[in-house]
Amino acid sequence: MNYFEKQPQTKFQSQQEEYQKQLMRSKSPIFEGAEGELYYIENVGRWLPSPKIINRRESTKNLYKGIRHAALSYFQLNDIEWWGQSENLYFPTGHTLSSQIHCLNHLFALRADKDAVLALIQTLLPNICEILPSPIDEKFCHMDNYPYKTPSYISFEFTCENRTLLNERCNKRGANCTSIDVFVYAKDSDNKHVLIPI
């Protein structure tokens, strides 16, 4: 198998893509009526809105409204780049199938709720007995200008020595290097500390 060739979509991926397209076409309140990004269709000979990519001016509407401001602040204060925005890496992608966006929309609101994170993790890993504060976000809790004073139990865009271990150009969280979308730091029933990638 050649991993560099585009792989066929799974049934789930196809269903999700069609669902996102339906939401965009119907001007769903989920995306607050955002328009699709324009792209040129050669065989049609004109520019048409994308059925699954929100235009760059409205790309923040790809984030759930209830977490939008906090997620944007989290990325800015932690100097995390957004995936897929070549012009401005400080705004989220408009791609409605982005794993980065999906992780934030589903998990960001839980990040400070230790019990909720534990319950979520134990559905798959019942031997996890404690969720620990994130070591990469913990340092920011003590900064005067950092708005989140409670520990974070879910972290986003984790990297670790990418230059050395993966021979990549950078170690920066987010775009342009290999990152784990989400990770949780925990302790299992054997008292071992574990990193759980999501």
Where are the language model's segments positioned?
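Charged, terminal alpha-helix-loop-beta segments
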Residues: 1-197
